[in-house]
Swiss-Prot record:
Interacts with PCNA. PCNA stimulates the nuclease activity without altering cleavage specificity. Binds 2 magnesium ions per subunit. They probably participate in the reaction catalyzed by the enzyme. May bind an additional third magnesium ion after substrate binding. PROSITE patterns: XPG_1. Signal peptide: none annotated. Its EC number is 3.1.-.-. It comes from Methanopyrus kandleri (strain AV19 / DSM 6324 / JCM 9639 / NBRC 100938). Belongs to the XPG/RAD2 endonuclease family. FEN1 subfamily. Structure-specific nuclease with 5'-flap endonuclease and 5'-3' exonuclease activities involved in DNA replication and repair. During DNA replication, cleaves the 5'-overhanging flap structure that is generated by displacement synthesis when DNA polymerase encounters the 5'-end of a downstream Okazaki fragment. Binds the unpaired 3'-DNA end and kinks the DNA to facilitate 5' cleavage specificity. Cleaves one nucleotide into the double-stranded DNA from the junction in flap DNA, leaving a nick for ligation. Also involved in the base excision repair (BER) pathway. Residues 340-348 are annotated as: Interaction with PCNA. Mg(2+) 2 binds at residues 170, 172, 234. The gene is fen. It comes from the Archaea. Residues 1-98 are annotated as: N-domain. GO terms for biological process: DNA repair; DNA replication, removal of RNA primer. This is Flap endonuclease 1.
């Protein structure tokens, strides 16, 4: 929702993982784990161990993280905390959609139908989150617990210069002020399109906040947030019905802000569809709850701990796990030996 509707007006920069070498990337953990749950499947169902516990998230997190480090990227995963109260409606809608999809999954007769609805019912519960944190600890990969929205924490770390960019599929990172957003960082490669079934090549994309503002003809992040509010955000999911992307952009360009629209004929319609005053919605993006309580250290992986967790407890192949650990050790050594590989992007 929101900025995603402006996709046709925004031109991201297509790149590859090698171009991100030497960069610290704060990855939206919930976003990445949900991708793993919905794409790493067998016969339309997530991977499971012999006790029926889901392992797709562990599979994706292990091998994708190793791949990123091998490309010279320093990932740090950021986990969501308590969502703001205004997000409850969005979360309730998601819950209802999952219940509807669950009923369709029960009636599914083909593999394609099972895969489709299995993706829609995937849930990231507390046990899966704790699994992921335990795995990252054993891998020596840092993670951060956000007090509220994970993307807000990622953006804060990027603004502070502790990481170079946010890694997420969602455009909200830009609303939270991340100077750079890297999309598709955890799903690079050939993938089956979730709706058409077509095999497509997925490549990383970089979106710079300054470039997005320039392409949209906006002067500030505050204007970008007001634009998103008109289109709909997680805190006002319906936006303002009847005001599409182009009309919303025209209004913000012409009047400068939602506040300046209060004396126009269109304001009663806008006000009717906002759950609270615009300033309260703005503050969720411009002044989100974040923390400085984090340390970014990439440590030596605990090979035997990983074997105990993944092989003995979760039925992974010992040979594959040990090979992954060896790859991770070698990649981390290369990072320490080579240091930060500056690119021209560092100067912009």
């Amino acid at each position: 929702m929101g900025l995603a509707e402006l996709r046709e007006l925004i031109e991201p920069e297509e790149t590859d993982l090698r171009a991100l070498a030497g960069r610290e990337i704060a990855i939206d953990a919930f976003n990445a784990l949900y991708q793993f749950l919905t794409t790493i499947m067998k016969d339309g169902r997530p991977l499971m161990d012999s006790r029926g516990r889901i392992t797709s998230h562990l599979n994706g997190l292990l091998y994708r993280t190793v791949n990123l480090v091998e490309e010279g990227i320093k990932p740090v995963y950021v986990f969501d905390g308590e969502p703001p109260d205004l997000k409850r409606e969005t979360l309730e809608r998601r819950r209802e959609r999952k219940e509807e999809a669950m009923e369709k999954l029960r009636r599914a007769k083909t593999k394609e139908e099972r895969e489709k609805y299995a993706r829609q019912v995937a849930r990231l519960d507390e046990s899966l989150v704790e699994d992921a944190k335990r795995l990252l600890d054993l891998m020596g990969i840092p993670w951060v617990q956000a007090p509220s929205e994970g993307e807000a924490q990622c953006a804060y770390m990027a603004r502070c210069g502790d990481v170079w960019a946010t890694g997420s599929q969602d455009y909200d990172s830009l609303l939270f002020g991340s100077p750079r957003l890297v999309r598709n960082i955890t799903i690079v490669g050939k993938r089956k399109h979730p709706h058409t079934g077509e095999i497509i090549e997925v490549k990383p994309e970089i979106m710079r906040l300054e470039d997005v503002l320039d392409q949209l003809g906006l002067e500030s992040r505050e204007q970008l947030v007001d634009l998103a509010i008109l289109l709909g955000t997680d805190y006002n999911p319906d936006g303002v019905p009847g005001i599409g992307p182009k009309r919303a952009l025209q209004l913000i360009r012409k009047y400068g802000s939602l506040d300046e629209l209060k004396d126009t004929d269109i304001w009663p319609k806008i006000e009717r569809h906002l759950p609270v005053e615009p300033e309260k919605l703005r503050r969720l993006f411009l002044e989100p709850e974040v923390t400085d309580d984090y340390e970014l250290d990439w440590d030596e992986p605990d090979e035997e701990g990983l074997v105990e967790f993944l092989v003995e407890e979760r039925d992974f192949s010992e040979d594959r796990v040990r090979r992954a650990v060896e790859r991770l050790k070698e990649a981390l050594q290369e990072l320490r030996k080579g240091g930060r590989q500056e690119t021209l992007d560092a100067f912009f």
